[in-house]
């Protein structure tokens, strides 16, 4: 082979290797990206019919948390539609009424059966020892 052909072959092999590496990186990133649907998107979209696991995000409706012996149910809303969620397991400490949550699971017979519940938190979190009291006590 001529030197020119060897160089061309090396450049082509380098491009193929770089393309394969890029394809691998993008496929791994796609699996780790964590987006979610709103309750309206889930209930009106094609995801409603599929039995594939999806993530749904919204706010926990106040007064909707009901605990039974083996599960917890609550309603999740995007302020347009509500979705009833059933979960068996430990809830995160930040979970509560009026708090943002993301649930992962499947929609079965109008109820969302969650495998995982994540509570969103305020980005302005500050530990208790650093917080300033809202009102100082009256001196006696």
Curated annotation (Swiss-Prot):
Residues 29-140 are periplasmic. GO terms for cellular component: plasma membrane. Heme binds at residues 121, 125. Keywords: Cell inner membrane, Cell membrane, Cytochrome c-type biogenesis, Heme, Iron, Membrane, Metal-binding, Signal-anchor, Transmembrane, Transmembrane helix. The chain crosses the membrane at residues 8-28. It is found in: Cell inner membrane. One of its GO terms (molecular function) is metal ion binding. Belongs to the CcmE/CycJ family. PANTHER family: CYTOCHROME C-TYPE BIOGENESIS PROTEIN CCME HOMOLOG, MITOCHONDRIAL (PTHR34128:SF2). Heme chaperone required for the biogenesis of c-type cytochromes. Transiently binds heme delivered by CcmC and transfers the heme to apo-cytochromes in a process facilitated by CcmF and CcmH. This is Cytochrome c-type biogenesis protein CcmE. The gene is ccmE.
């Amino acid at each position: 082979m001529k030197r020119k052909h060897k160089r061309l072959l090396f450049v082509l092999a380098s491009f193929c290797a770089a393309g394969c590496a890029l394809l691998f990186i993008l496929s791994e990133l796609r699996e780790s990206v964590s987006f979610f649907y709103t309750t309206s998107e889930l209930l009106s979209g094609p995801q409603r019919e599929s039995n594939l696991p999806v993530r749904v995000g919204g706010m926990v409706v106040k007064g909707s948390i009901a605990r039974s012996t083996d599960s917890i149910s609550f309603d999740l809303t995007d302020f347009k539609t509500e979705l009833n969620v059933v979960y068996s397991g430990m809830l995160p400490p930040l979970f509560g009424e009026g708090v943002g949550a993301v649930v992962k699971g499947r929609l079965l017979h109008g109820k969302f059966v969650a495998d995982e519940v994540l509570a969103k938190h305020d980005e302005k979190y500050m530990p208790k020892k650093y917080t300033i009291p809202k009102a100082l006590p009256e001196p006696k």
